């Protein structure tokens, strides 16, 4: 979620992910994301959505899926991660052995989890 040009998701695709869903609402970066998918020949299993991440993960098409890895990379200092994790948890979108990887600014509070999703490890890089 909050995919930008798709670098993280496309790296997962290049390493064997069977299906990748990339969400970004930016009118500036979405065409780049789409072009990157096409350039890499991943259009058959990489699906991109030019919309608000919350709306997409609440949609019937997505919320019925179970994911092994979910990357959440929202704009810094927006406190968006708790709501995303709540939606993922309430819709059982994370597989039993799945993981969520998030990235936040160092001034943001680390989110400890929600219901069946809990923080296992945190690392600090940079500021």
Regions found by a protein language model. Give the residues of each.
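Class I S-adenosyl-L-methionine-dependent methyltransferase catalytic core
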Residues: 1-127
């Amino acid at each position: 979620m909050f995919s930008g040009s798709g670098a993280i998701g496309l790296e997962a695709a290049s390493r064997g992910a069977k299906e990748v869903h990339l969400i970004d609402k930016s009118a500036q970066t979405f065409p780049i994301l789409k072009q990157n998918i096409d350039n890499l020949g991943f259009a058959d299993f990489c699906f991109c959505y030019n919309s608000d991440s919350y709306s997409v993960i609440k949609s019937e098409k997505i919320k019925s899926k179970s994911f092994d890895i979910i990357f959440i990379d929202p704009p810094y200092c927006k406190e968006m991660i708790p709501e995303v994790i709540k939606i993922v948890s309430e819709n059982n979108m994370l597989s039993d052995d799945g993981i969520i990887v998030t990235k936040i600014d160092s001034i943001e509070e680390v989110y400890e989890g929600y219901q069946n999703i809990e923080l296992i490890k945190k690392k600090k890089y940079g500021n």
